Amino acid sequence: IYINTDTTASADTRARRVLFFPAGTYKINSALKIPPYAHLVGEGPDKTIIKNSGSNAVMVMQDDDGNVGSNIGNSGATTPTQIQVENMTLRTSVAKVGVSLDRVTNAYFNNVKFHGSYASGGSDSSDAKGVTVTNSTATYTTTNVVFNQCQFTKFARLVDLSFNCTNVKFHACDFKTAYYGALIGAEMDGSTTGLDDGPRDIQFTSSSWSDIGQQAILVSPA
C-alpha cells in the first residue's frame, strides 16, 4: 500500500492520502502491510471485504522503509503511526491472525469487522487471533490504539495481548464466537524482551460478548 503508487508526488504526500475501497471482496494470499500515516476506508463491514487465504495475518504494520516484524524501526525508519482503518471487514479463511499491531503508535479502527474461521464449540488455537501484538519492545512499544464500534468473530482468541503494549481501548465493540473473548498477558514472563512489561491500560467499555467457550476476558495473574 502506498509504495511507488505515484512517482510524481513525494513519499509523504502519497502516504497521507485516504485510500478508498469500494464495496467488493478483495482477495489476497499474503499479509496487507500498513505503513505510517495510512488511512484505509471502505463502504462498511461485509460490504468491503479484504479476504486473506494465506497462512499469515490479514494485516500487519510496516515502517516507511518497508520493514515488518522485528525489523520495524531499523536504521532510523519511521515506525507505524497515525494509522486509520474504517468501514470494512478483514477476513481470514484459515486459523491465523486478523491484525498484528507491531510497534505501532496512534492507530484507530472504526466500524471494522474482524472475521476468522473458528467454529462455535471448537478448541483453543494459539494461531487464531483476531487482534494481537508481537515484536513490541521497551524501545518500540505498541501504544494508543483504539477500536471503536468494531466486530470480532470466529477466532479462537478474539483478542490476545501478551507483548508490551499500553493504552489499547475497545469501545462499543461486539465479541462473538470464540474460545476466549480476550486473553490478556498470558505469555508475559517479566524477563523476555517484549514480554517483560506485558500489556498495560487495556480497556473494554460498552461492549458485549456472546458464544464464548471459556472466559470473556481472562487476565493473567502475573
Feature-to-residue mapping (PLM):
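Extracellular beta-strand solenoids
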Residues: 21, 28, 34, 42, ...
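Low-complexity intrinsically disordered segments
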Residues: 4, 102, 139-140
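Right-handed parallel beta-helix/beta-spiral solenoid domain characteristic of secreted/periplasmic
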Residues: 39-97, 117-122
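Short, surface-exposed loop/turn motifs at beta-strand boundaries within globular domains
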Residues: 12-14, 33, 78, 83, ...
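N-terminal extracellular ligand-recognition/capping segment immediately after the signal peptide
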Residues: 1-39, 43-54, 89-90, 94
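Structural detector of coil-to-beta-strand junctions
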Residues: 18, 31, 56-60, 82, ...
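Intrinsically disordered, low-complexity Ser/Thr- and acidic-rich flexible linkers and loops
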Residues: 8-13, 65-77, 122-125, 136-139, ...
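Right-handed parallel beta-helix
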Residues: 43-47, 79-92, 105-118, 140-157, ...
